[in-house]
Amino acid sequence: MEKFKKILITGGSGLLGTYLCKLHPEVIAPPREEVDILDARAVETALDKYKPDVVIHCAAFTSPPKVNEKPIEAMRVNIVGTANIVRAASERNIRLVYISTDYVFRGDKGNYKEEDELCPQNYYAWSKLGGECAVRAYKNSLIIRTSFSPDVFPYEKAFVDQFTSRDALSVIAPMLFDLAMRDDVTGVIHVGTDRKSVKELALKLGKKDVQDLFLKDVTFNPPADTSFDLSKLHNILRP
């Protein structure tokens, strides 16, 4: 990092936002009561008050099963809320980093590159792609597609037939923060680690008694293989 940057994070009380706040003592993370992203005026007021150099937009409706139950609410938060952030940031020329998801891909081949065809398979993925579309309208922005887990795997079951580049938050979050601080990195980038099944990830994170789960056992239509081609990431973050 060449100079100090003032960073504002939306969704600072969430899993990712909380961890990002720990990485830099001066991160600003206004509570939802102050910055409801569905309130365009509140977003503008916060950016004028804190005058950040970078906004990392983590706030989102993130649970695919819950999104299936409340798709309209999810679309509002993930698309309209993101559009409010984009407009306010662009009017003030503030760098915007948007946290997206690997679920924007169909999941039929894996090893996805940033420019590969997008084909969401559930409401959650569509809502996050809608947010991406809003962010793409602003040149001073970075879309980070990623997937992460708490460092302690939180579930009793894990998919044996779903493959991903997901990893522990302690691995993913520092890379996100590093990229957010690089003004020359714009567009879209994939962040993750090697391809693995979700069960393999659970075992890696110490969940030795995790039970098998299969894609056919759930109703929210998760994609089968959203693993990433990480060439772009490695070229940027190489030592």
Model-based region annotation:
Residues 38, 69, 73-84, 118, ...:
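Glycine-rich NAD(P)-binding loop of the Rossmann-fold in SDR/ketoreductase-type enzymes
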Residues 40-77, 88:
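NAD(P)H-binding glycine-rich loop region in Rossmannoid oxidoreductase-like domains
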Residues 25-46:
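Adenosine-cofactor binding site in Rossmann-like domains, unifying the SAM/SAH pocket
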Residues 155-183, 187:
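Substrate-positioning beta->alpha
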Residues 175-225:
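Mid/C-terminal beta-alpha module of Rossmann-like enzyme folds, strongest
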Residues 2-24:
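N-terminal Rossmann NAD(P)H-binding glycine-rich loop of SDR-like oxidoreductase domains
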Residues 119-147:
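Active-site Tyr-X1-5-Lys
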Residues 84-119:
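Conserved Rossmann-fold NAD(P)-dependent oxidoreductase catalytic core, especially the SDR/UDP-sugar
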